[in-house]
Regions:
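Crotonase-fold acyl-CoA enzyme core
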Residues: 95-211, 238, 242-251, 257, ...
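Glycine- (often His-adjacent) and acidic-residue-rich active-site loop
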Residues: 54-96, 112, 225
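Conserved CoA-thioester-binding segment of acyl-CoA-metabolizing enzymes
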Residues: 1-55, 71
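Short, charged, surface-exposed hinge/linker loops at domain edges
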Residues: 215-224
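Terminal peptide-recognition signature
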Residues: 15, 19, 34, 52, ...
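Charged catalytic carboxylate motif
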Residues: 29-33, 89, 96, 195, ...
Length: 264
């Protein structure tokens, strides 16, 4: 049984972390498969949105510390080897996400801890089941947030709260995560995937070029001034107004029907 299951539902690609007996602790196979799935979905015109969730009653409990301990007992790696392994193995999904141009959603069921919380944070947004719990638990095992926690968390909840959560490793339940802006919606556990997939499908049904441009422009705007952002939007606007999908949207509006977008 593979450590990651993939399913296509309409225009949504669903990736399910699949080590439920280990609370979906990350394995090298899982990270390999997920990073490859992201690259493939980004190139597939039939995919409009990507959703990550976990099998069983957990989203992801972080890295597989048991497996890591056995490997280190067999051979103690040098500091350089540790650094290179972190970059090439543990961080490969974060690097794939950085290049992913389509909408990316985390559907958090149960616990998201350490690298599991980081995986949720690196998505464009998160929705949660009522039983979801989040913890940057690295501090409890003497580690640093190695998969983007120091980068993503302050941008979502602000620096003071991020530092508190990183320093303490405290758990945040679903309602508190909603209050902090860590998740956009909290659904009953039994409805999490149905409602997440409905939302993902609504997004995926949008015009593909415009979806990608909105994501790119919104992220770029976090690192530039207003004038530069407006100029960039203007340049992209000139392009999208020449697309068939723009013309289809205007025609559908006039005809009072749902537009059919083709990504061109």
């Amino acid at each position: 049984m593979a450590d990651l299951e993939l399913e296509t539902i309409g225009r949504v690609r669903l990736a399910r972390l699949n080590r439920p007996d280990k609370k979906n602790a990350q394995s090298e196979e899982m990270l390999d498969l997920l990073s490859a799935a992201l690259r493939e979905a980004d190139e597939d015109p039939a995919v409009g949105c990507f959703v990550i969730t976990g099998a069983g009653d957990a989203f992801c409990s972080g890295g597989d510390l048991g497996r890591r301990s056995k490997e280190q007992e067999a051979r103690d790696p040098t500091p350089l080897e540790r650094k290179e392994r972190l970059a090439k193995v543990s961080q490969r999904v974060a690097r794939a996400v950085e290049l992913f141009e389509k909408p990316l959603i985390a559907a958090v069921n149960g616990a998201a801890v350490g690298a599991g919380m980081d995986m949720a944070l690196m998505c464009d947004f998160r929705v949660a089941g009522a039983s979801a719990r989040f913890s940057e638990g690295y501090i409890r095992v003497g580690l640093l947030p190695g998969n983007g926690g120091c980068y993503f968390l302050p941008r979502i909840v602000g620096m003071p709260k991020a530092l508190e959560l990183l320093w303490t490793g405290d758990f945040v339940d679903a309602d508190e995560a909603l209050r902090l802006g860590m998740v956009n919606h909290v659904y009953p556990d039994a409805e999490l995937m149905t409602r997440t997939l409905a939302l993902a499908q609504r997004i995926a049904d949008g015009p593909p070029v415009q979806l990608r441009d909105i994501k790119k422009l919104t992220y770029q705007a976090q690192h530039t001034d207003l004038r530069t952002s407006l100029e960039s939007v203007s340049a992209h606007m000139a392009v999208v107004q020449s697309t068939e999908d723009y013309k289809e949207a205007i025609k559908a509006f006039k005809e009072k029907r749902k537009p059919v977008f083709k990504g061109r």
